[in-house]
Amino acid sequence: MNEQSTSTTTQSITPSTGVVLLAFGKPQYYWAAYNLAFSIRKHSPNVKITVLFDDPIKALSHCHDLMQYINHIGHIALEDIYTNKKLDPGKVKVNLYKYLPYDRNLYLDVDAIAVKDIQPMIDELTQSGKDYISHCVGYHTIDKGRDFKEMQWAWADKMWAHFNLLESYVMPAINSSMQWIVKGSQAEAIYRTAKDLYFNNPIPIKDLRMKWGGGQPDELYMNVALAIHGIDPALKAYTKNDSSEGGMIHFAMQRGLSFQDITENYYLQSYYGGAGFTPRFYIDWLDRMLAADFKAIGKRHIYLISRIAQNKYADGKR
């Protein structure tokens, strides 16, 4: 009997990486996803993009050529979108983990436009070695008092008492418009805790320091979950001079940086917040830029940012 030798070759599998967008509610959010996907594809042709919709058929009827700019679409279950028949965006975002299609996910709110190649941004996030990163604008400990200036959703003493937090906890303040999520035990635990707090122990809306379109803000519960798990969500150590996370997304409440400054130092320009929150200076710039980019490929810029910005959930109009 001849002995047959076998050799086993071990191949490393490269983790999948891509951008994840959420679009639900009014058609304007489909339009926003379309514009953002188009801008990413223009600057970063090899980056994978998945858009998660409440109603993919309806969404594609509004943006019929969207599939030219994305790789995949997904469907969000209605029970993760509505509470008592009312749209609940915070609920969608605390449920985000179970919908993530990649091993390494760059989640972006759709109210932004890429102004250059985002692959270096993804590379930097990957090389950080961290499993969860968000745009971090500050930290708070309860000994600093009740006013957590960087986190407008609730007073610090209210959060510490309501959630029975330890005095030693350090709470971050994130802007969840950008989240880097590596699937695994750490990220899963963060979202599991945030969901549990959101559904089973929420601060009553009437007691919130600031309202968000009549619903619960996901950032509040993500901040508490991060504090409980002792996780710093910042890409780099936060300082007062660098709250922009190393220049990834430009958020503006007033006119400041020039267009050149933004394109040199940031990857995306956001138009977050309600109508009038982001200065018209930047809104008009984005529309001009998109109009030129669409014209270059023989198309028209149909879904104007100026119109989308008038229909944001933050105003309770969604």
Description of each model-found segment:
Residues E124-R192:
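Conserved catalytic core of nucleotide-sugar-dependent glycosyltransferases
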Residues Y30-F38:
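Short amphipathic alpha-helical segment that frequently serves as the phosphate-/nucleotide-binding helix
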Residues K91-R146:
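GT-A fold catalytic core of metal-dependent nucleotide-sugar glycosyltransferases
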Residues K58-L100:
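Active-site-proximal specificity loops/subdomain of glycosyltransferases
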Residues S39-V47:
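Short, acidic, metal-binding catalytic loop of nucleotide-sugar glycosyltransferases
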Residues I49-D55:
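Short internal beta-strands
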Residues N2-T6, T10-T17, V51, A161-R318:
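A glycosyltransferase accessory/donor-loop signature
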Residues V19-K26:
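A conserved hydrophobic helix/loop-capping motif in glycosyltransferases and polysaccharide synthases
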